[in-house]
A protein has these predicted regions:
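C-terminal edge-of-domain segments
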Residues: 1-15, 116-198
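Short, basic/aromatic recognition patches
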Residues: 9-37
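Anion-coordinating catalytic cores for phosphoryl-, nucleotidyl-, and glycosidic chemistry
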Residues: 18-19, 27-28, 61, 73-74, ...
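Short beta-strand segments
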Residues: 33-68, 84, 95
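Short, surface-exposed beta-strand-loop junctions and turns on beta-sheet-rich folds
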Residues: 55, 69-71, 172-174
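Structural motif
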Residues: 60, 81, 114, 163-165
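Short, structured beta-strand-loop surface elements
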Residues: 68-127
């Protein structure tokens, strides 16, 4: 039986309220997540998504690109409205006797907000200090710290979130996984060819 489509939820509302991450969980996840994806929209109406290394400081996403003309900077100039997404896949597991009774543990954060270009050199320096502390912590390869001679050839962006949602699927205990426990989403299904096969 086909389900009748329902009206889409308002932006920022999650249908699965049982999977909502707390604000503290979202903050911790964004602080350590490795890579995010930024979605912009161009003057031609096409969306454009790029992966970015980033930092999360004082409830703001910071990222950078090289100082050159491309889709990303053109889209930012066209519209400051963006979406930013981070996810972390976990372990695939079975929870029932039907093949499609398969799921995965995960964490995912999506935000909608406004992006700006940072022109202040002190702000850009703080970004690069936090960026290098995250991706190349003190002691990495024994190099000089705090020198950013190519800062002038980069563009630093700040995304101020307006709406942030976090969603997670927690890996169940082994005792709650198939075949120890059958939590199938299709309780009436029987193996094909069995006498009760519909």
């Amino acid at each position: 039986m086909t389900k009748t489509p329902t009206a889409p939820p308002l932006r920022g509302q999650l249908r699965r309220t049982d999977k909502i991450m707390t604000a503290a969980e979202v903050d911790e996840f964004l602080a350590r997540a490795f890579c995010g994806r930024t979605a912009t929209v161009g003057a031609d109406g096409y969306p454009y998504v790029v992966p970015n290394l980033f930092t999360w400081l004082r409830s703001t996403i910071y990222l950078h690109t090289v100082l050159s003309e491309g889709h990303f900077i053109a889209n930012v100039r066209h519209s400051d409205r963006v979406s930013f997404q981070v996810d972390e896949p976990g372990e695939i597991f079975a929870y029932g006797h039907v093949e499609c009774d398969t799921s995965v543990s995960y964490r995912s954060v999506i935000m909608f907000g406004r992006i700006t270009i940072l022109d202040d050199e002190a702000q850009k320096t703080r970004f690069f200090e936090s960026f290098m502390a995250k991706y190349a912590p003190a002691g990495s390869w024994g190099r000089e710290r705090g020198s950013f001679p190519r800062m002038g050839s980069t563009i630093v962006y700040a995304i101020a979130p307006e709406i942030v949602t976090g969603k997670q699927g927690i890996l169940p205990a082994v005792s709650d996984q198939w075949p120890i426990r059958n939590l199938t989403g299709s309780p009436g299904w029987k193996p094909k060819g069995s006498p009760s096969d519909p």
